[in-house]
Amino acid sequence: ETQQPYLEVSKEMIQTFNRQYSERVIGQEKSKKKLLQAIYPLVDGKQSKPVVILLYGDSGLGKTESAQYMAELMGGKLLRKQFSMYQNNESANYIFGGRYNEKSFAQDLLARETNVLLFDEFDKALSIFHSAFYQLFDEGIYEDHNYKVVVNKAIIMCTSNYKTIDEIKEHLGLPIYNRFDSIIKFNDLSGIAKEKIAEREIERLKEDYDIEDRELFDKIKKGAVTQSNAREIKHLIKDTFSLVALKKICGETEV
């Protein structure tokens, strides 16, 4: 079954991504350039085979956010699948196709909003499932027992929390590793990037929590530098703001 028409990568989309990426994902300028290089062959339909990209590095550095932003620019929601869940027979039916009316990956592909796919923690699935994706990565065709789906001009992003290329090769194996068009490392955040993330999150939340305390904000920014990633920084700020708000409600001594 052929795909419905999806927005293609255009020069305008490339320009917008280049200009605005750093507002969405802080501290990953190198990754931005490599992402743009990777998707460029799709500009204005030059290439019909999907571009398959592996994003690796610690969690909370912007891998998922990068894919979400790309999907927004391509007109809708990301098709996101959590591969760490694919560990049993039920998963085999989902990936390879079970009964015709049973929920399957092929059906989800047909129902997707955009041509941007995210396979989160791709390395965590049982390795037997990787073989189901060889043809999709090579030719843009996904075939199970019931459906044949043509997925032309797609951007397929896989994520992994491994730290090095050698680890990825060892755990994923060469048959799938060699099918990636681009392998992009997301680096650990610098102190400046962490402060910037904290600053942005403070601005986003301070009105909701009715907090305007410069001294507190400066302390939070200093504390942010000791955190590992954006997720931890956001938790730190939310927890701190919640505590301050509770103290206002309950009185200083009650919390």
Where are these regions (language model features)?
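Interdomain "pre-motor" coupling segment immediately N-terminal to P-loop NTPase/helicase cores
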Residues: 1-10
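Pre-Walker A (pre-P-loop) alpha-helix and adjacent loop at the N terminus of AAA/AAA+ ATPase modules
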Residues: 11-53, 241-246
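Conserved RecA-like P-loop NTPase ATPase core
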Residues: 27, 35, 64, 95, ...
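Walker A/P-loop
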Residues: 47-81
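C-terminal alpha-helical "lid" subdomain
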Residues: 72, 80-81, 174-178, 187-255
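AAA+/P-loop NTPase substrate/partner-engagement loops
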Residues: 73-101
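Hydrophobic positions in the central parallel beta-sheet of the AAA+
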Residues: 81, 117-120
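Canonical AAA+ ATPase core
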Residues: 101-105, 121-129, 137-193, 204
